[in-house]
Structures are given as structure tokens and as C-alpha cells.
């Protein structure tokens, strides 16, 4: 199988931020809304839900290897991860629609990616009791990663300078809305919907093997310890960064000269970006926005 050629994918200009059902979005994630809203999930679908830049690609790749690594190894060299794990709401000129990719995915189960906040997830996922793997990342590193992503990705709104972006992040004026509502929304959902595994990026960095084992247990997979070890090695940052199928280098709308998709993969990189004043302001806003939640993030590991 040939690697798909997306060199014709071009964006004339960066998209504007729009208000969509109370959430900041761009048309690239809302233009296909009727089909997204009415998407028919299946009971064995696995929805990988994240706020952008929280570790989506990492978990997507782990899931793909767990289910299909041995069964169809050719997938690993012929299909970029974003084709194997469709991005449900994606609607870019020159790329297949996320809903179409998902509908035509030949695999079972179907791993499907979304950044939608919990209230916008198509209701069929809940009705079908599909499994949901949510990955959350601490707000400060998430903001830094998102800033660099917006700089290099012509499919995202212009981020401005770091200070401008950080103010927008604290106000929730990013694509897919406020980080705070996103992480809290899925955390709350977990209290009434038991088929969610809530994972943390920091835990994955600390001990990837342990988190792969947690995933297997949630998914009901009896993957051997040797196999899990092999997968754990294959999904390390440096390995994924070199792998064309997982590093997004096949998408022409991203300018790696500005910043690579696989940028640093670290916990605590925010310290290289936040000034003391920005950090104090951020902590104040964080305390306010997170005062009614029990979800706890670790920033020191
Ligand atoms: N294997 C591994 N180990 C550690 N970190 C990893 C790994 N794979 C991806 N990443 C880091 O995750 C960030 C990208 O997040 P997403 O995949 O969620 O991006 S996206 O929302 O799908 O565009 C981005 O974070 P930053 O490096 O901090 O920018 C990636 O480098």
C-alpha cells in the first residue's frame, strides 16, 4: 500500500475562531457538524478523547499497536496514524472527512479520535456504551505545547506572541474551548458513565509500561508482558519522532521549521516559557476555575 499523498492539501489562510454552541471552534471542526452529530458509534468503538496537545497521538499509537500491531504490521509502515485513528470532527479541504474515514475504517474495534468537549460528543457513543480513553495533561505544559502547535499549523488560528496566547488560554479562547471545562467535563462524566478510562500524560511519561498495562486492563486485553514491553519501547518519544507514520511530517499544513509536531515530550517545559508574573496570574486563574473539581494534576515528577 502506498503512503497517501496529501501534498495537494493547501489552506489559503488561517481560520477565524468562531463561537459554536458556546465553545470556541474553527470551521474545520464544525463544517461537517450534521454528520458528526449523527455519527453512528458501535459498542466496540474506542473513543480517544483529549484536549489538543495532551498526548492523543501517543495513546492512539499505543492502541493501534495493541490491537493491530501483530495482526496487520503493514499498517505501521503504510498509513499515517491520523488515517488509522480517524479524527472524527476533522473537515479539511484535501483530506478525507473524519466521519468518512471512521465509517470506512476496516478494523474492529475502531479507534476514533476526538477533541470535542464532552457535551459535544455524538450521543451514539454514550448510547452504545462505547469505551472512552481520556488523556489529560497539566494545564501549563498543555498551554505551551498548544502555543507551539498553533505557530506551526496553518490550520489553526494565529496564536500571537506567547503572552497573548497565554491570556487567550486562561480565557478559554482556544479551539475546543477552555482547558478547564474540558478536563473537568470528562472527569464529571466518569462519575456516571463507567466506561471511561481517565489517564494523565504525566503518568505516561513517568512509567509508560505501567500505563500500557492499565490500558490493557481497561480494554480487557490479555496482552503478554513481553508484548507490552515491546510496545512500550516502540512508543517512546524519540522512536515516534523518527517515525514518519507517527510524527505528522506527511501533512503539508504543518511547518516543522517553525516547530516540530513531536516537539519535546517533557513534563515541566512550562518553566522555560512562563515568567514569574505569568505563573502567578495563571495560578490565580487556575485556583478559581478548578475550585469545584476533585481532579488532581501532578506537575512535579
Ligand atoms: N511518545 C511520546 N512521549 C512523550 N510525549 C509525546 C509522545 N508522543 C507525543 N508526545 C507529545 O504530545 C504532544 C502532542 O499532543 P497530541 O498528540 O495530543 O497533539 S494533537 O492534539 O493530536 O495535535 C507533543 O507535546 P510537546 O512536545 O510538549 O509539544 C508531543 O511531543
From Swiss-Prot:
This is Cytosolic sulfotransferase 2. It is an enzyme of class 2 (transferase). Keywords: Catecholamine metabolism, Cytoplasm, Lipid metabolism, Steroid metabolism, Transferase. Sulfotransferase that utilizes 3'-phospho-5'-adenylyl sulfate (PAPS) as sulfonate donor to catalyze the sulfate conjugation of a variety of xenobiotic and endogenous compounds, including 2-naphthol, hydroxychlorobiphenyls, T3 (triiodo-L-thyronine), T4 (thyroxine), estrone and DOPA. The active site is at residue 115. The gene is sult1st2. The keyword Transferase applies. It is found in: Cytoplasm. GO terms for biological process: catecholamine metabolic process; estrogen metabolic process; sulfation; xenobiotic metabolic process. InterPro entries: P-loop_NTPase, Sulfotransferase_dom. Gene3D superfamilies: P-loop containing nucleotide triphosphate hydrolases. Belongs to the sulfotransferase 1 family.
Amino acid at each position: 500500500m502506498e503512503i497517501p499523498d496529501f501534498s495537494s492539501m493547501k489552506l489559503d489562510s488561517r481560520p477565524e475562531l468562531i463561537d459554536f454552541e458556546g465553545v470556541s471552534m474553527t470551521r474545520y471542526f464544525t463544517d461537517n457538524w450534521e454528520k458528526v452529530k449523527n455519527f453512528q458509534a458501535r459498542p466496540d468503538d474506542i473513543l480517544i478523547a483529549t484536549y489538543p496537545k495532551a498526548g492523543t497521538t501517543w495513546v492512539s499509537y499505543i492502541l493501534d499497536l495493541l490491537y493491530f500491531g501483530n495482526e496487520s504490521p503493514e499498517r505501521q509502515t503504510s498509513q499515517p496514524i491520523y488515517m488509522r485513528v480517524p479524527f472524527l470532527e476533522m473537515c479539511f479541504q484535501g483530506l478525507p472527512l473524519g466521519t468518512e474515514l471512521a465509517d470506512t475504517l476496516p478494523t474492529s474495534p475502531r479507534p476514533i479520535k476526538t477533541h470535542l468537549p464532552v457535551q459535544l460528543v455524538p450521543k451514539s457513543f454514550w448510547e452504545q456504551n462505547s469505551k472512552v480513553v481520556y488523556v489529560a495533561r497539566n494545564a501549563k505544559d498543555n498551554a505551551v505545547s498548544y502555543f507551539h502547535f498553533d505557530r506551526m499549523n496553518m490550520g489553526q488560528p494565529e496564536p500571537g506572541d506567547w503572552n497573548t496566547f497565554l491570556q487567550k488560554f486562561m480565557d478559554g479562547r482556544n479551539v475546543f474551548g477552555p482547558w478547564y471545562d474540558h478536563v473537568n467535563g470528562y472527569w464529571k462524566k466518569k462519575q456516571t458513565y463507567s466506561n471511561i478510562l481517565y489517564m494523565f500524560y504525566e503518568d505516561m511519561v513517568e512509567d509508560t509500561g505501567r500505563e500500557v498495562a492499565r490500558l490493557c486492563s481497561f480494554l480487557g486485553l490479555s496482552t503478554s508482558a513481553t508484548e507490552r514491553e515491546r510496545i512500550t519501547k516502540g512508543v517512546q518519544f524519540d522512536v515516534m519522532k523518527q517515525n514518519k507514520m507517527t510524527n505528522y511530517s506527511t501533512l503539508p499544513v504543518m511547518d516543522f521549521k517553525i516547530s516540530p509536531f513531536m516537539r519535546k515530550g517533557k513534563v515541566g517545559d512550562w518553566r522555560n516559557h512562563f515568567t514569574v508574573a505569568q505563573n502567578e496570574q495563571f495560578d490565580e486563574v487556575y485556583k478559581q476555575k478548578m475550585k469545584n473539581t476533585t481532579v488532581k494534576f501532578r506537575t512535579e515528577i
